[in-house]
Amino acid sequence: MHSDRLGAHHATEYHLLDVQRVAALGQRFPRAIARIFTEAEIRYCQKHRRTPFQYFAVRLAAKFAVRRLLGSGRLAEIEIAHGTLGNPVVMLHGKAAVAGVGKSLRLSLSHEGNVAAAFVSVECPLEVSN
């Protein structure tokens, strides 16, 4: 984590996942998908009928990276959605939302073949005590 002249902390985190491992998890334990992902995330991933687990894997990678940056929250409390321009955005619920107060999260997702990658950066104001 580093600070800038404007009085903010910046931190980054990335996570890589093997798509086949996520597919095996989903096929062996289908209820795990419902515990990890929101209904909106499940609908979005299942729209991609030929490669749904690439989409699940990249979202799971993002959830792991966000949780590591926040230090709190269940995976289901971290939702990966889309902004108005189609860009990935993080929506926080429950304890993750409390941990994320005042923090600006930016997200980049990528998947190619059997690898899913997520890069997350967070900016939060410095706390000044007198």
Regions found by a protein language model. Name each.
Residues 1-130:
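Core catalytic alpha/beta fold that binds nucleotide/phospho-ligands
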